[in-house]
């Protein structure tokens, strides 16, 4: 909410120059005002939607998946998704209002991700089984393929097949236009 307020305040100053993080400098005061205003409106929309869903008791992992952003915001050139998605902003809003608790009972005192991954890998039939499944999903569900690659890697970080899978899946995810992943950490 503070971000939206700050953007509206900046828009009211009739600035003659705006240097955005991406793209060319803006020098038309009307265009600057419109850009700042639509950014504020977008943030306000996400905050309002997120808070309304939380107040209805919607589980957090479903709140950000329930976003149905109005077309005029989705198609506005100023709101071209670069690094942060609408869902990411909703998650930030939730973190502010509800903290770390995500309504999933096992997350209260969870096992480490490494331990969870080792058990998931074992249940799946080993790293090779996860490798086959993740690669089968690469073209249709890169997000799920990423989860599977993470389980293989974190469950068995010394396994060369797990490392190759992790690298291949995230290299694919970087170039996938449906994902806002821009970089990768490779071990």
Q: Residues of each region from the PLM?
A:
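Alpha-solenoid helical repeat scaffolds
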Residues: 131-132, 161-167
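Alpha-helical segment of the N-proximal tetratricopeptide repeat
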Residues: 116-155
